[in-house]
């Protein structure tokens, strides 16, 4: 299926809160013909569950793979300092030799991952922190002296070097819950969109028409509709199944994320699904 790329998406919690396991699964994904490996971003999850830091894990994956795109889908930028995040991402892009994708979103579990640690869980506040944070991250990646005065953050005449390997920046994919519009207007400013559809269960898929509506809305807010732009969707397939994926590609899909984890069986079942390869040749 020309132009479509397929990646494995994995949790960083529970049985998957083991960085050694995640690195092993990433290596299997690369050997099995997948184009990418992305992991979740959680600070806490169910009581008693293990959690692996996503970016430390991605750094380890970068050193053990050479071809697959890697990253975290989706990072809650509102609970990270943007200048530290900018430095970390530039370093990861260097470590991976230009294979990093930066996923950004509002974040889930506002009580467990924001309020419990003294962070403001209000969605409006988090949206504002994301917008200012992205301004700062991109400004610091420019390789030029950068200053910023926002309502939440301030940066004074800072120069960050080296710049990321990928220029003008690593791809930034914005996640959001459709049909809420704010995240998709943000996505229109960057390099890709990763919609989660309200009312669609974890084991279900949106219709191709739902995806097409989200894509059209986002593209309508881009200044250059012809510029490269990724449309990312997660789903569940059972081996090669072009008939499942092709209607979504017709709706604009460019990246299929195979959603794997405990909800699809054992870790051994995850290994087997990865080794079966992507749903399209």
Short names for language-model regions:
Residues 1-281:
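Active-site-adjacent structural elements that line small-molecule/cofactor binding pockets in enzymes
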